[in-house]
Amino acid sequence: MDVYGMSSPDLLRIDDLLDFSNDEIFSSSSTVTSSAASSAASSENPFSFPSSTYTSPTLLTDFTHDLCVPSDDAAHLEWLSRFVDDSFSDFPANPLTMTVRPEISFTGKPRSRRSRAPAPSVAGTWAPMSESELCHSVAKPKPKKVYNAESVTADGARRCTHCASEKTPQWRTGPLGPKTLCNACGVRYKSGRLVPEYRPASSPTFVLTQHSNSHRKVMELRRQKEQQESCVRIPPFQPQ
C-alpha cells in the first residue's frame, strides 16, 4: 500500500517508535538513586576520603578515646590551651589581695644644709642701763592742749568768746582756736555769717536794740549802722 507515494517497507513502524520496555527506566532510576546516596553521604561526612587514598592519622593518647582529632589540630589546640593558661597565670588568684602601687613621688633638688649662726642669748647681750638712759626712755606724757585764756574764766568755766555764753550743747572752733565758740556762734562762723550784731537770745550780752539772732534782722541793723556812720563822716554843708 502506498502512502504519500512511498511503499510500506520504507515507512517506520510505529511499534519501533513506541517502545515501552522498562529496563532502561529502572536502570536509570537505580543509577540516580545510587548517585544521590553517595552525594548525601559525602555531604554528611566531608572529611571522608576513598579508602585507597586515605590513611588514618595517628591519634594522641592525651585526649579521651571518644574524641579523635588529627595531629595537626591537636598540636594547635595544645598551643592554644598553653597560651590561655599563661595569660590567666599573670592575674592573681584573689583580686582582693592586690597591693596598690604607691604613687611616684618626684623628689626635687635636695636642699643644701648651711650652718646657721646660733641665736644670741638674752642673758649675754643684756647690759644694765644708766639712770639717765632710763629717764630718757620713759615715755613723755602727751602735752595737753592749751586753749585761749579768753574762753576760760577765772574759776575754770568755759565761755563763748563772741557772746559770752557758758551753756551750750557743743563747743565749736572759732577764730581763736578750737572750742572757743558756742554751738550757735560756731555754726554761723563756719558758714561765714558771724557778725558783731549777732547774739543768741540766751547770751548774757544780748541787747535788743543792738543784737538779734535772726539773719534778716541782723542785716537791717548793719544797714542802719552803716547809714549812721556815713552821716557822721560827711560834714554838713556850710554856705559861705
Curated annotation (Swiss-Prot):
Residues 104-124 are annotated as: Disordered. GO terms for biological process: positive regulation of DNA-templated transcription; response to light stimulus. It is found in: Nucleus. It comes from the Eukaryota. A zinc finger (GATA-type) spans 154-208. A motif (Nuclear localization signal) lies at residues 109-116. Its main location: nucleus. Keywords: Activator, DNA-binding, Metal-binding, Nucleus, Transcription, Transcription regulation, Zinc, Zinc-finger. SUPFAM superfamilies: Glucocorticoid receptor-like (DNA-binding domain). Signal peptide: none annotated. PROSITE patterns: GATA_ZN_FINGER_1, GATA_ZN_FINGER_2. Belongs to the type IV zinc-finger family. Class A subfamily. Transcriptional activator that specifically binds 5'-GATA-3' or 5'-GAT-3' motifs within gene promoters. May be involved in the regulation of some light-responsive genes. This is GATA transcription factor 4.
